[in-house]
Amino acid sequence: MQLFVRAQELHTLEVTGQETVAQIKAHVASLEGIAPEDQVVLLAGSPLEDEATLGQCGVEALTTLEVAGRMLGG
């Protein structure tokens, strides 16, 4: 299925739903150079846990995930 990831740019990823959020962060790191530990992946404004699979998070085809940077001291 296709998934959209909006970080600094909008990216289209081909995924199965079995990928973990940590794997998506690693992919975003390779595309944009943002370290995985500095990323927060959001689905409808709610942060997703690194260990969870996309399927467990309720991610469906054509979903857009937002990637935000962690705020220091926030």
UniProtKB/Swiss-Prot annotation:
GO biological process: antimicrobial humoral immune response mediated by antimicrobial peptide; defense response to Gram-positive bacterium; innate immune response in mucosa; modification-dependent protein catabolic process; protein ubiquitination
GO MF term set: protein tag activity; structural constituent of ribosome; ubiquitin protein ligase binding
Pfam family, one: ubiquitin
Domain of life: Eukaryota
GO CC term (a single one): extracellular space
PROSITE patterns assigned: UBIQUITIN_1, UBIQUITIN_2
Family as reported in the entry's similarity comment: Belongs to the ubiquitin family.
Note: This protein is synthesized with ribosomal S30 as its C-terminal extension.
Protein name: Ubiquitin-like protein FUBI
Organism the protein comes from: Rattus norvegicus
